[in-house]
Design a protein with these regions (language model features):
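Family-specific signature for flavin-dependent thymidylate synthase
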Residues: 1-205
Length: 205
């Protein structure tokens, strides 16, 4: 994962501008970072990270590309005229189906591609996007295990370069202080681990 903007200095100086203060040339304190992330004030949108996810199931990429605020996604195409690996797999499948008389009328080669095939994607997210996506994709009750694991790995990578932002990337129940998914609650909110996570998330120390 790579930071693509001048780190937290840009964030703090944008915040200082709104208060009519002069810019500074050093990173703000950890306490400032935690407070502004919890408050979700607009300057946090200036903090952006690029990352790559490799060998991700195609249908999982579909889950991630639904998010559109504060992020951009670039997924490896499945077009056979560009992706030769996909072309080989698809043609072999069609040969087998043809032998068994299972080809569907009107279908093209691309219609036979597996959604479980591994694919690669790049993403750019600002801090607000990380927070928003985590609320949905870290949920243990409503998110598929595969998508949750993929996003957890993203947050683990983020933690290596920005541990404070990663700390504020939590599932919906931690973010809101209760589980709003009354029909699909996983029970995490009833555990001591949840209370500890909630305390950690809300801390500015």
């Amino acid at each position: 994962m790579q930071c693509v903007t001048p780190n937290w200095i840009r964030v703090v100086n944008a915040a200082r501008r709104t208060w009519g203060k002069k810019p500074i040339d050093h990173e703000p304190s950890d306490k400032f970072k935690k407070k502004i992330l919890l408050a979700e004030h607009s300057p946090i949108r200036l903090l952006e990270y690029d990352f790559t996810i490799e060998n991700l199931r195609q249908w999982v990429t579909v889950h991630l590309v639904r998010h559109h605020e504060g992020c951009e996604k670039f997924v490896h195409t499945q077009r056979q005229d560009i992706n030769s690996e996909v072309e080989v797999i698809t043609k072999r499948l069609i040969e087998v189906l043809q032998e068994e008389g299972l080809l569907r009328e009107g279908w093209k080669e691309r219609d036979y591609m597996f959604q479980g095939e591994g694919n690669d994607m790049d993403m750019t997210c600002n801090a607000q996007a990380f927070i928003n996506i985590s609320r949905k994709r870290l949920c243990m009750g409503c998110t598929s295990p595969e998508t949750r694991l993929a996003w957890k790995l993203v947050i683990d990578a983020l933690r290596e370069v920005d541990s404070i932002l990663a700390e504020k990337c939590v599932p919906e129940c931690v973010y809101r202080g209760f589980c709003p998914e009354t029909d699909r609650c996983c029970g995490y909110v009833n555990t001591e681990a949840y209370q500890e996570r909630l305390k950690e998330y809300r801390s500015i120390e």
